[in-house]
């Protein structure tokens, strides 16, 4: 009888121990489930952060592409401005050459006019000298008349030459006026071109400043991309670690659940054994 009591006490103690272990296993399973849920929540949070970082990276890359496109446009504008400046310089050079040729033609026409005027003056003086002498000699008069006719002929020729020179001079003066007008227009154009050059210079300086700013922004974007890439790698590493932790916790939960099932089966076996023992005692 004492042996039965001892056996019953031992079985009861083993039952209590089994219950304690079962409760402990259940608590450990609950704790493991909580840790697993927490790890899953952290993994979801990390996944959201990774998505946000990827979105930030996409936006930064898009901004960098826009900055590069604007920089290309500014380079094209700078090249166009340089081409315009070169064309304007060529036009100024052509205007200056045209003005020099007009001045040369004017100087030539003025010299020819002076020569014609001098010849006409000499003929007129000779005619007046011959008329003032009043020679009685007919032959001398004839000679003088012939000389006069010749002088008149020369004067007429000189007049014709003078008229021709005057006409050419008028043409030259007209050309000169047009040249002066072109020169004035050229000077105005030069002033306009100088103003355009000044504006272009300011634009070039502005473009250089914009290019420097764009380069600085590009460096900042590169640094941001580098930082975001580092953060992305770190987040991926944390996500992988969290995933491994979840898998490890899931294995621990499975193990504890298996152990709990085993303890429950063991507890059921002890209960069945106690029932059989009580039945035997009652039968005795």
From Swiss-Prot:
Offer one example of a GO biological process linked to this entry: regulation of muscle contraction
Per the record, the coiled-coil ranges are 1-266
Question: Entry's InterPro entries?
Answer: Tropomyosin (IPR000533)
Write out the tissue specificity statement of the associated record. Expressed in striated skeletal muscle (at protein level).
Is Coiled coil among this UniProt entry's keywords? yes
Report keywords, A-Z.
Allergen, Coiled coil, Muscle protein, Repeat
Listed Gene3D superfamilies: 1.20.5.170, 1.20.5.340
Q: Which domain of life is it from?
A: Eukaryota
PROSITE patterns xref list:
TROPOMYOSIN
**GO function term, MF aspect, one:** protein homodimerization activity
Q: What is known of its domains?
A: The molecule is in a coiled coil structure that is formed by 2 polypeptide chains. The sequence exhibits a prominent seven-residues periodicity.
Q: Which family does it belong to?
A: Belongs to the tropomyosin family.
Instruction: Describe the protein's quaternary organization and the partners it interacts with.
Output: Homodimer.
Q: What does this protein do?
A: Tropomyosin, in association with the troponin complex, plays a central role in the calcium dependent regulation of muscle contraction.
Q: Identify this protein by name.
A: Tropomyosin Per a 7.0102
Give the originating organism: Periplaneta americana (American cockroach)
